[in-house]
């Protein structure tokens, strides 16, 4: 499935080989220094999150079970990245939310095939933020994801594919 996605579904052949964790450089330093990638809930509790990248409005309406998991995207260039990337004056941030800011964005890449074999890993076809999307697990469910939409990078189908560009992989442990 991953090979087929690399060869036939993604505009960038290496994207389907990885799971992408999006964060700010200050958080990346913390992650690399500790050797651990924490869920939002654990990072907040342990006070290891230097920059709160996400919109408070979005986090407040996201299920606590989701923020208790480590989250990855199937691809870069997500709508979240578009809204939050780069230093922005607070008045220009997503819905005026001061937290929705990633001054120096960093993606940490993880081997997707290995990640998917870990116990408890699930994935969704769209974002887990807000009310969240249905989560799946297993090879059969993975094969049914709409990778043509998940990896689509065109403007022609943007209204259809935008939510799929947020597709996520979640791991239950930090």
Predicted regions and their residues:
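Active-site-proximal loop/hinge segments that shape catalytic or ion-binding/gating pockets
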Residues: 1-174
């Amino acid at each position: 499935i991953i090979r087929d996605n690399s060869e036939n579904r993604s505009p960038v052949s290496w994207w389907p080989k990885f799971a992408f964790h999006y964060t700010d450089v200050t958080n990346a330093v913390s992650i690399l220094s500790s050797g651990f990638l924490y869920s939002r809930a654990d990072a907040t509790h342990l006070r290891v999150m230097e920059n709160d990248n996400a919109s408070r409005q979005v986090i407040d309406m996201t299920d606590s079970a989701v923020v208790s998991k480590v989250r990855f995207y199937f691809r870069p260039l997500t709508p979240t990245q578009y809204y939050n990337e780069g230093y922005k004056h607070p008045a220009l941030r997503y819905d005026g939310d001061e937290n929705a800011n990633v001054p120096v964005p960093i993606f940490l890449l993880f081997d997707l095939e290995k990640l998917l074999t870990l116990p408890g890993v699930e994935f969704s076809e769209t974002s887990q933020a807000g009310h969240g999307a249905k989560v799946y697990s297993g090879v059969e469910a993975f094969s049914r994801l709409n990778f043509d939409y998940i990896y689509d990078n065109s403007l022609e189908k943007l209204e259809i594919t935008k939510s799929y560009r947020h597709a996520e992989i979640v791991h239950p442990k930090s």
